[in-house]
Structures are given as structure tokens and as C-alpha cells.
Amino acid sequence: MSDQLRDAVWRALDTVLDPELDEPVTDLDFVETCTVSADGVATVVLRLPTFFCAPNFSFLMVADAHDAVSAVEGVVRADVTLADHHASAEINGGVAAQAGFVGTFADEATDELDELRRIFLDKAVIAGQDRVARPLVDAGAGPDELAALTLGDVPPSADLDRLRARRAQLGLPHDDDAPLLLHSDGSRVSSAQVPLHLRRARLTRIGIETNGEFCKSFLKTRYPDRVGTA
């Protein structure tokens, strides 16, 4: 039973994203350990590429992981902590007490992290449009065709599923009738705006993916003997 429950906990962790990189903490190898006791206590230890990763990003990941694991059926308690970080004690204590970011860093933080999460989700949506549209551009689709496309017109793919999910999180149109190319406010991109919009989307995607590769490299350097051991 504990093996099945651990698998369920791991699947829950698959839904927890690094907000800046838009990748699951499991894929990024940020999960140091994940165990579940016979009485249903799930213990998860997260790690990050550097000792000084931003506290706000770090707090989001630990808090999201705690919420995701706590929601797994059969888990009676979730102990989720962050190791080897300059603010580990504050983050771990704040998440355990469900104090929120402001309550945890009362002398430094003035706002909760909802707006930060929204900013990075917006970037993920922009980058996702490039991932989905790029094969169409490479196949010869022009601005008029791209501006007219809906999500239902696009071949199914993991990138399309991810784009729909991120749009849903932001309250943006994400059904089959929704335009493929959207501005951040949900308005359709016109054919005249397509080249500049896709240029911005491509640069955003490249920036996110480059940062992701840097983080993976830093993690391997920091934990050369402990990568992929969770």
C-alpha cells in the first residue's frame, strides 16, 4: 500500500512547477527524497540548484508541493521541506504553519505571491504559443493562416495540452474555438501582429529554456552524486 501511495504522491509532485521555468520539480530533479510511512505520513525533501535561489520562488515550490501532497487520498500528514538553502528554516517553518509568504517573511515581504505566479504563467502562455505555432511556421503557414487558427485546428500534442492548461489557470480562452495566438489580455492577435508576436514568443521560450538548462547544470554541479536519486 505504501508503494502505491508513494506513486500517488509522486504524481502529485509532477503537478508542482518551478514558476520561472514552467517545468515540474520532478523533471528538474528538485526532489531529493520522497517517502511514505506505513501510517500515511508523506515526507518530501526538495533541493534547488543554488544556496541563494530567490526565497519567493523557493517558497512557492515548497508551499505548492505541500498542498499537492496533502491533497493525495491516503496521506494523513505531509512533511515537505527545503534543504540546503539560505532561507530553509524560514520557508520550512512558514509552510508548515501555513503562514503564507508575508507571514513567513514579515520584515521583507509586503505582498503574497499571486501576482508573481500570474506573471510567470503569462510568460509560460506566451512561450507555449511559440512551441505550438513553430512547427506550423516551419511547414509554411503565414500570418493570415496563423491568425485565423484555433486550438481545435492544431494537431494534438503535449505542448498543446500544456498551453491549454496554462491558459485555463489564467482564465484565458482554452477550448477548441479559442484562437491559437492571443495577447495577454485574451484578445486575438491580428495577422499584421503575428510576426512581432511570434518573435516575442520565441524569445520568451528561449529565455525560459536557457534558464532551465542553467539550473539543471548548476544542480548537477552542486549534487554530483545525488542527481536522479529520489
Where are these regions (language model features)?
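Domain-level signature for proteins that mediate thiol-based redox and metal-cofactor handling
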Residues: 1-51, 56-230
